[in-house]
Amino acid sequence: MTLSFITRWRDELPETYTALSPTPLNNARLIWHNTELANTLSIPSSLFKNGAGVWGGETLLPGMSPLAQVYSGHQFGVWAGQLGDGRGILLGEQLLADGTTMDWHLKGAGLTPYSRMGDGRAVLRSTIRESLASEAMHYLGIPTTRALSIVTSDSPVYRETVESGAMLMRVAPSHLRFGHFEHFYYRREPEKVRQLADFAIRHYWSHLDDEEDKYRLWFTDVVARTASLIAQWQTVGFAHGVMNTDNMSLLGLTLDYGPFGFLDDYEPGFICNHSDHQGRYSFDNQPAVALWNLQRLAQTLSPFVAVDGLNEALDSYQQVLLTHYGQRMRQKLGFMTEQKEDNALLNELFSLMARERSDYTRTFRMLSLTEQHSAASPLRDEFIDRAAFDDWFARYRVRLQQDEVTDSERQQLMQSVNPALVLRNWLAQRAIEAAEKGDMTELHRLHEALRNPFSDRDDDYVSRPPDWGKRLEVSCSS
């Protein structure tokens, strides 16, 4: 089957990119590819059997027209000016059978005009982390970019140490970022901001294209998508680590996996990025940061969208966030209905977990085993203050009895939203260390496990992290 690529971005937004081709690595070789995703995209298996090829930037497929995008942004709350694809190249936009498109973005593809002081490369460590994280999030049901392939090489890349140069093929319906809009707003070119908005609406919100108030309606949906995404992050204990405006997806996708982390111990102020000295992007601050970022996006639209309409959309953020968060957390607790005491029970559980440094994922998974007519709970042994847990658990069981469902029905719901497996940093690190020694077995094994996060397991993927695996420091270097 021949893959079809189109050039919408190149044709319709000529001032937003520089056309250039990838720079191949030395002795590049394909070490992992996503068979399930490749099948979904109708990619012939033969493309994965001819060396690094397109996956290593050595060849282009017919119809591809590679380019690096320019955008700007606020980083850690400070205007950073022009940024752009410093090591990534958009190879092409694949046209799928249903009329939708999928960007093929090659990360680590070499120097671009936007590399600034960088070398345009990615390392094996960071490409493995992004591949694992994006696929883990996908199978958790959270909107995200996806990983299609990893290529490693003999090219040295200099970071804190000398590492192997690598490339990741990332795919997504669009790589439109808040930062694209900021770039032209701060260059005082509002007509180009409008062109970006028109492009987005035409191709991704086409049902709004003929609406008189299309820009307000579109921005309102961007707000809603962002609020929903952040709510989902919070419910699974995911910390992004670097929520700069240039890392915010217009479509509400999780984008740019760098120093991310899933909660081990429940620590509301968890900081996964060791460069985040002030805790701006701490776990509990993510909802506020996302709203701040949306306010920056709204500012770029203010030359042609009524401020009252933009503010109305921004005002909807908190309610959308709380609605999505509340619905999911009630499911995690096994509540089939909404009752006035639900928030108090949840907050009391969080307080208990924070005092005890309880494991976030294990706590909710073990809670899924609760039988409402039994005072015994396998979760009890996870707490030191048994009296405090017993008090909470007694009130929790009374609350469960208000919903007329069987234990089996409730447990099935809870186990469908409380994963047994999340991508803890130590699991990723173990796969990385093996891969850096040439052994890809654990990389493939972990990828396979992450496809079924809600299934019970009895291996160390679902155990508490070892002492060395807790609070692994992760930086933005990739």
UniProtKB/Swiss-Prot annotation:
Gene Ontology terms, MF aspect: AMPylase activity; ATP binding; magnesium ion binding
Pfam families documented for this protein: SelO (PF02696)
Catalytic activity, EC: 2.7.7.-, 2.7.7.108
Active site feature: 246 (proton acceptor)
Catalytic activity, as annotated: L-seryl-[protein] + ATP = 3-O-(5'-adenylyl)-L-seryl-[protein] + diphosphate; L-threonyl-[protein] + ATP = 3-O-(5'-adenylyl)-L-threonyl-[protein] + diphosphate; L-tyrosyl-[protein] + ATP = O-(5'-adenylyl)-L-tyrosyl-[protein] + diphosphate; L-histidyl-[protein] + UTP = N(tele)-(5'-uridylyl)-L-histidyl-[protein] + diphosphate
Keywords: ATP-binding, Magnesium, Manganese, Metal-binding, Nucleotide-binding, Nucleotidyltransferase, Transferase
InterPro entries the record matches: adnlytase_SelO, SelO
Cofactor(s) named in the record: Mg(2+); Mn(2+)
Enzyme class: transferase
Top-level taxon in the UniProt lineage: Bacteria
Chain positions recorded as ATP binding sites: 84, 86-87, 107, 119-120, 170, 177, 256
Residues involved in Mg(2+) binding: 247, 256
Free-text function comment from the UniProt entry: Nucleotidyltransferase involved in the post-translational modification of proteins. It can catalyze the addition of adenosine monophosphate (AMP) or uridine monophosphate (UMP) to a protein, resulting in modifications known as AMPylation and UMPylation.
PANTHER family: PROTEIN ADENYLYLTRANSFERASE SELO, MITOCHONDRIAL (PTHR32057:SF14)
Family as reported in the entry's similarity comment: Belongs to the SELO family.
Alphabetized NCBIfam families for the sequence: adnlytase_SelO (NF040880), PRK00029.1 (NF000658)
Protein name: Protein nucleotidyltransferase YdiU
Organism whose genome encodes this protein: Escherichia coli O81 (strain ED1a)
Taxon lineage: Bacteria, Pseudomonadati, Pseudomonadota, Gammaproteobacteria, Enterobacterales
